[in-house]
Amino acid sequence: MKKRFIMVTALLVASASAEAATVQEAFDAATAAYDGERWADAAAAFDALEARLAPHGRSAAIVRVRKGIALAHLGRPDEAALSLTKGLADLPAADATLAIDHYDGKMALGRADEATFQPLAAIAAFEQAEPLAPDALSRLEALSSAARVETYTDPAKALVAIDEALSLAQGKISDKKLEAQLHTIRGRALLNGSQFAAARKELDRAVDLLGGLTLKVGVTDLAARSDLAIAALLAGDNAAAKKYLAYAASGTLEDGFARGANMDPPDCGAATGLRPDDVAVIEFGIGADGTVAYAAPVYASRPGPAVVEFARAAAGWSWAPDRLAKIPSLFRAMTRIEMRCSEAPTRPTMQNSLDAEVRSWFAAQHLTLAAQSGVAATDLAAARRDLTARRAGAASAIALAPFLFEIATNRAAPDAERRAAAGEWSLATLQANPPPMIRAAAGLAASGAVATSSWRKGSGPSVTALKLLDDPAIADDTRTLNTLRIRFADQYLERRAYALAMPLIEAVIADSRLASADQLRSAALVRRSAIDLAGGNLPAARAAFEQSGLSEAQCALTDAQPAVTRHAGGTQDYPVEAIQWHISGWAMTEFDINADGTTSGVRATIAYPPFVFGQPTVKIFQRTKYTQTYRPAGGSGCSGFKASQGFRVL
């Protein structure tokens, strides 16, 4: 960071008291850390000093602004924004000695707002910083920062700001990398404004300023070449686009960019402001802990503030250590992905219900629960810390169970760690004499049925898991017993083992303890209907469906997920240019499965690299066939089904 710090030699009004001298010394020490860019030390020192000052005075304002700047550098934008907002509100505007604090504070606030997906607030902060800039380079920084955010919220406004920045830079900047960054921002503004030919020209200039299409690739080269590839793709020049992607090293990983543990797109609808036809390219980086360090939009088919919802979704993704290890450091630092919002309805699963019941039982036992942030890697790190602390404090086995449960069910944890945690939490829980449903959940975990990736589609229930049906405590509880029966039947149905699934389903239907309209009985009847249909017995399928009492819409949410009967992918689906340039990748889709096993409404929601494998994947799943389900009017057999397809050059 360029030093533009003006020392404030006396934080407080002159005083003879020893306390005042102590505060001044503390301020000087914090300032030394701040000036030396030791951000953690500076943030801690200013935080301690803030508590000793009057809340709304000049001194407190200076401390809060500088603490906020330090926090922003530490990647703690929420805390930074809070401190900066308070500090800037009380910072005297007419005090010339604080001019740099005003500028630096506004710039830091803009970056914090940008990082927390508040684009309009970020733009406002950058625009307020621009007239406060102490020199031409600082003004250039403010203009280009505002333009960078405006590229995806208001491309026309971004062009005005970046053109002013380029005019200011003309003849004054010899740094080609900085000049390339300015042309990249201008290119993105044109790209988001659908001026693809002009965008290509601008982005091509940025690439040339960085040395052209060489085999040397750094983060800056990666961004510029990727932008150029996107512009070429949107302009319809696929051959050139694939070449640029190859030089950006996008898709050159053997198996494509390793997918995260929970790569969910944002929902479409009023809550996000996103429409099904919206598409965005999001740039993000992954930290050493497997969490997303930053995420920001690069391109939006419909520019506006709502596009940050794509970036917000990406910020919640996580990578398990074994997956993260497959991603080279360059791509962990920065990669791009194509995204669309999800129209899939929330489909309840038995495992989600079991997990919720286990957590509720822990809470009812007055046990401290593991933190739930929604980010798998963050929750995993917190559970590990809490578990270590409680082991050191000789906590009881059951007190450790909630944290072990979090690790066992966290997709960012390595398989071996999940297995060990599952065995430990289940044993502790079983020893606490839990109610039948919790006993079943613990038994499943102990059997290895859900603790690791070994419980996968098509594997069927393990022998140990099936023995839970004979546990007297479970057998005596109607709901727990029949929940397990349907769960195990579904695992058989996934591999079309109808003969193994049918006895379990018939047992649910025959259980006289269930009411005729009970959801478990209805779910079993729907599954029997599908098995009868697969066996060619249409009258039996119709009768079972009618006995379920469910509508077609209810059925689509409660039925077992259909299994693939014919996967239609082949070499003909691999884009020719991608083969020529050895580009690998993948795409994730969602669609409905009709009662006859065909698909409809196939959409690519996430794809890597952008605009390469999304449409080929859509075509594959448009041809793929699934098991048939009985629906009287031929409606949807399964709504919001999700599937992915990988592409690999051998």
Which positions does each model-derived feature cover?
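N-terminal signal peptide c-region/cleavage motif recognized by signal peptidases
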Residues: 13-18
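Bacterial N-terminal signal peptides that target proteins for export
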Residues: 1-7
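…; additionally, a secondary subgroup of soluble metalloenzymes is captured
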Residues: 10
